[in-house]
């Protein structure tokens, strides 16, 4: 059932799942209405907004990766209130400590040779490649001299300088190797 106004909500109708924006959760009509509030992409939600949303529940589950997308728009809040809720909660830790939450430690996107590097550099060595990701490889054409392996991270030096927004030199190399 779609609601155009949060004031139309009747939780006596047996609603099991309710989705809404931060603004909907901050509405006084929502006070203590939810058993749990799941905040997806919590790295994009400021502490100030999370505090406002928290009036709807006693249990909050933050979901997301603080290393990915940051807040799309940032308000000016005093102290730490403007930080993303994940950054604030993690207190500069790269990954969630076991006593504070659950890290989904498997990825089905990254080939193991890429994942191993990313895991070591960004995720405290706690991320692993799973499933069919090991089969994600490049087919290298015989005349290609730039790409020397089918999977992993490879440095290809390109001679250019001062390109901050676009690089024709990089585009040319990509065209050559693709």
Predicted features along the sequence, with ranges:
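Conserved helicase motor core of SF1/SF2 NTP-dependent helicases
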Residues: 8-10, 23-178
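Short, Asp-centered acidic motifs that coordinate Mg2+ and/or phosphate
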Residues: 16-17, 36
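A substrate-engagement module of RecA-like helicase motors
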Residues: 1-16
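Short beta-strand and adjacent tight-turn residues that come in two discontinuous sequence segments
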Residues: 20
């Amino acid at each position: 059932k779609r609601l155009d106004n949060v004031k139309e909500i009747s939780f006596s109708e047996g609603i099991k799942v309710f989705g809404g924006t931060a603004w909907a959760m901050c509405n006084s009509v929502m006070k203590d209405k939810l058993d749990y509030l799941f905040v997806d992409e919590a790295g994009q939600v400021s502490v100030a907004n999370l505090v406002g949303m928290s009036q709807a529940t006693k249990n909050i589950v933050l979901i997301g990766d603080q290393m990915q997308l940051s807040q799309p728009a940032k308000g000016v809040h005093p102290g730490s209130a403007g930080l993303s809720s994940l950054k604030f909660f993690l207190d500069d830790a790269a990954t969630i400590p076991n006593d504070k939450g659950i890290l989904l430690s498997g990825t089905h996107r990254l080939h193991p040779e890429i994942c191993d590097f990313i895991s070591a550099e960004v995720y405290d060595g706690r991320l692993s490649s799973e499933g069919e990701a090991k089969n994600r490889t490049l087919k290298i054409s015989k005349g290609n001299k730039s790409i020397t392996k089918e999977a992993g991270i490879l440095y290809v030096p390109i001679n250019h300088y001062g390109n901050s927004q676009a690089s024709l030199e990089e585009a040319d190399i990509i065209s050559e190797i693709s």
